[in-house]
C-alpha cells in the first residue's frame, strides 16, 4: 500500500510538469505575469510583487538561518514531490523526521552494543550542498528531465531580501548558484535524502556495503 501511494505521488508531480509543458508554461514566468497585471478594485494596476523572497532568522551561537519563500503556484506544483520524498524518508529506519524520540532510543541501543557513537552534520548545507548532486539523486526517482525542471523551478529565479540601511529600506536580489532554497516544498526532504546517501557513500568508501 505504501509503495502504491509513493508511486501515485510521483506520477502526480510528473503530471503537473507535463501539463505546464503542454501549455508552454513555466510556473515562475506565469507567476510573474499574474502579479504584474494584477489590479485593485478600482481597476488600477498594482505594483509588481516579488514572488521569491528571503527571510533571516537568528539562532543560538550567532548563527543566522536563511529561509526562502516562493509563490503558491510553485508550491502547488511541488506538493506531490514533497509528499513523495517524505514517504521515502518515512521508510528509512534510521531517519528521525517523523519520530525523533524513537531515533534517539535507537542510537542509544546501537551505541551500547558497539561501545561507540558518531554524529554527522552538513555544514551550510542549504547554501553549499550542490543542487547538481541533488538533481543526480532525484533523477533516479523521477527521471532526469523532471529532476532538472525541479532545480530550474527553485534556482532559476530571483529572491529578494529587504534590509534597512540608515533610515531607508532597501531591497537586493539574489540567486542560488550552488545550493537550493530552504523553504519551498520538497526542498528540505531532498536535502535530508541526500544527507542519507552521502553518509552511506562515505561508509562504502571505508568498508564494503552499507549500514542501517
Placement of each model-derived feature along the sequence:
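Viral RNA-dependent RNA polymerase
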Residues: 1-212
Amino acid at each position: 500500500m505504501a509503495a502504491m501511494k509513493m508511486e501515485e505521488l510521483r506520477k502526480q508531480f510528473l503530471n503537473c510538469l507535463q501539463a505546464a509543458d503542454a501549455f508552454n508554461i513555466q510556473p515562475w514566468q506565469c507567476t510573474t505575469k499574474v502579479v504584474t497585471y494584477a489590479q485593485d478594485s478600482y481597476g488600477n494596476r498594482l505594483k509588481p510583487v516579488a514572488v521569491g523572497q528571503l527571510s533571516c532568522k537568528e539562532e543560538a551561537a550567532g548563527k543566522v538561518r536563511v529561509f526562502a519563500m516562493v509563490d503558491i503556484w510553485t508550491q502547488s506544483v511541488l506538493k506531490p514531490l514533497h509528499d513523495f520524498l517524505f514517504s521515502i524518508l518515512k521508510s528509512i529506519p534510521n531517519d528521525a523526521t517523523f519520530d525523533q524520540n524513537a531515533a534517539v532510543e535507537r542510537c542509544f541501543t546501537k551505541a551500547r552494543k558497539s561501545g561507540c557513537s558518531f554524529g554527522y552534520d552538513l555544514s551550510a548545507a542549504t547554501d553549499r550542498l550542490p543542487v547538481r548532486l541533488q538533481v543526480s539523486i532525484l533523477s533516479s526517482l523521477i527521471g532526469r528531465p523532471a529532476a532538472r525542471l525541479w532545480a530550474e523551478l527553485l534556482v532559476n529565479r530571483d529572491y529578494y531580501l529587504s534590509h534597512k540601511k540608515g533610515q531607508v529600506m532597501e531591497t537586493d536580489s539574489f540567486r542560488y548558484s550552488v545550493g537550493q532554497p530552504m523553504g519551498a516544498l520538497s526542498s528540505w526532504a531532498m536535502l535530508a535524502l541526500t544527507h542519507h546517501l552521502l553518509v552511506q557513500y562515505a561508509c562504502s568508501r571505508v568498508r564494503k556495503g552499507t549500514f542501517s
